[in-house]
């Protein structure tokens, strides 16, 4: 799926958030554009102001889960790929010595929720959010860690699980339906 999403060109903004530059390689090898911190503001402004007459490639950013506001057509597809990493020394140390401690679990949930909020900024806004990576999916669906998410996020996760179970009976014989939207 990673290479599939990276190969497409979109008539709207599409964003993948990965926990490290290493995780971005599959996307960039297939056409996704890795955007560094110094280019991020320009890319966000481009996506916000674009009328999408010309299709755009998937924007890939590394370990930036907050501070990006991509409402409306600036982001109609958001991919969160794998469990986030901690950047600061204190959290990184805590994660290594107590990976299942409440504090780390709460901080991970907060970081994931911040990522989920990048594309939907208001009640009339919408986007498709794809969670990838066994570690991330396990974390958000685990009964213990699920309690660290807000009620709204828990509901979104339940809706996603329902959609996934319904879609198991169907398969895309062609990606033309996806490309139409």
Feature roles, as predicted:
Residues 1-18:
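Conserved interdomain hinge at the start of the Helicase C-terminal
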Residues 122-181:
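Long, largely alpha-helical accessory region at the distal end of helicase-like NTP-driven motors
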Residues 49-139:
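Conserved RecA-like P-loop NTPase helicase motor core
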Residues 19-38:
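Conserved helicase motor "Helicase C" RecA-like lobe of SF1/SF2 P-loop NTPases
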Residues 24-25, 44, 64, 68:
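Short, well-ordered alpha-helical microsegments
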Residues 13-17, 33-35, 117:
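Conserved beta-strand elements of the Class I
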Residues 30-35, 74-78, 92-97, 143-152:
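Short secondary-structure boundary/capping segments
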Residues 1-3, 33-51, 58:
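Beta-propeller and closely related beta-pinwheel folds
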